[in-house]
Amino acid sequence: MKLSRKESVQRRHRRIRKKVNGTPNCPRLAVFRSNLHIYAQIIDDVGQHTIAAASTVEPDLKKSLSSGSTCEASAAVGKLVAERALAQGIEQVVFDRGGNLYHGRVKALADAAREAGLQF
């Protein structure tokens, strides 16, 4: 039986999470992509807490965007999460694409975070 797209993403995400782990020195930049929005969190897996987060559902970001499901919106989230991480003193992260392919909105978020100063 063929897997649905959602099942494929979940299976890929479980496989990736076995290898990708965030530490206090090098936390994990986790990306979740839904049909309408995109979310990014910088997570310390050892301490089990979120250091910084950004998404297209935030009111100030939502007002400036025409849609939360575009590459432009993803780039804005990437830039915002990078700025918040740098304010917390985080420069080096591990990228967790959340089982999604590194293409389109996920790639736009990663590129914007790199341009804003995060290293991964």
Swiss-Prot record:
SUPFAM superfamilies: Translational machinery components. One of its GO terms (cellular component) is cytosolic large ribosomal subunit. One of its GO terms (molecular function) is 5S rRNA binding. One of its GO terms (biological process) is translation. Pfam families: Ribosomal_L18p. Keywords: Ribonucleoprotein, Ribosomal protein, RNA-binding, rRNA-binding. The keyword Ribosomal protein applies. InterPro entries: Ribosomal_uL18_bac-type, Ribosomal_uL18_bac/euk. It comes from the Bacteria. This is one of the proteins that bind and probably mediate the attachment of the 5S RNA into the large ribosomal subunit, where it forms part of the central protuberance. Part of the 50S ribosomal subunit; part of the 5S rRNA/L5/L18/L25 subcomplex. Contacts the 5S and 23S rRNAs. Belongs to the universal ribosomal protein uL18 family. This is Large ribosomal subunit protein uL18. It comes from Rippkaea orientalis (strain PCC 8801 / RF-1). The lineage of its organism: Bacteria, Bacillati, Cyanobacteriota, Cyanophyceae, Oscillatoriophycideae.
